[in-house]
Amino acid sequence: MDFVQTTVASFISLIPVTLAQSLILSFVVLGIMIPFRMLSFPDLTSEGAFPLGGCVCGVMLAAGASPLTAIACALLAGFAAGCCTAFIHLRFRIHTLLAGILMMTMLYSINLRIMGKSNLSVFGAPTVFDWVPFVQPGFPVSKIIAAGLIALIVFILLNMFFKTEQGTAVRAVGANPDMAEAQGINVWAATIGGVGLAGAFSALSGAVMVQSQGFADVNMGLGILINGLAALMIGEAIVGKQTVLRQLTAPFVGAIVYYQLVSLCLAAGMPPPDLKLATGLFVLAMLALPSLRRGRSRGPAPAREAFRE
């Protein structure tokens, strides 16, 4: 009983901090969802774009730039990284996963070049959290409000974008590139723009995270991809993925639930080094579950998702 009470008390005390962190990291999950679901383009650039945005933001803040300017520069850098991944795939016919691995590897050196060292402290620099009224800056409440407002704006803009002609073109390319090209859609522009948009959101997450934690590090994106996949799967299991609205909602819901589950595991005494193992096993189970269900049933196997190569 004492163990349960201690675990519950620790979990409740961590909820504000975890909620703020999950809202910030939900943009990475969004950056994973867009190429994966909208474009059928499995992409690994997020693991490099996340620290890229953090490094760019950290350098800009250290140079005296405003928080919004630093975030804008991080967005541009992440967009460029995503565009490069899509270009490598399209121009040189390299598999999407290999193109993402190449870009992620190169971004590590680029991040080191940007900062000039492996980590950079920006503690005390102005942040977007300082602008939240009636709340003391640096406290979880200010981070929840600021990150939640950014998430709401991003959600509304993306929902509007995917209802436009350009957004529909991106979805059409993901559904069937050959048919989209036959309909006069520029497959290159839609693919490069969509993957670039995903990279921009991953970089946005890194930039806001740096302003939240007060430092940038080249290794801050280590394991973020598998965490994002786990969060995306949880979100899709909760809200579904049948419509654009649900697909856009899933990353935010999944990120909040996933990081609360991580917080619960930590409160229960799970060693932090074991979290990545547990997350990997969870993702493996989610991916293997449909196959196991088909093995038990005698009905016809459902159609497999087709991804671009």
Predicted regions and their residues:
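Membrane-interfacial amphipathic/re-entrant helices at transmembrane-helix boundaries
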Residues: 1-28, 64-69, 131, 135-136, ...
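Single transmembrane alpha-helix segments in multi-pass membrane proteins
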Residues: 12-66, 71, 87-92, 233-245, ...
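Transmembrane alpha-helical segments in multi-pass inner-membrane proteins
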Residues: 202, 206-277
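Helix-loop-helix "hairpin" substructures at the membrane interface of multi-pass membrane proteins
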Residues: 66, 81, 139-225, 230
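Transmembrane helix-bundle core of multi-pass membrane transporters
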Residues: 96, 100-103, 107-163, 193, ...
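Cytosolic-side transmembrane-helix boundaries in multi-pass membrane proteins
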Residues: 10, 175-182, 186-189, 246, ...
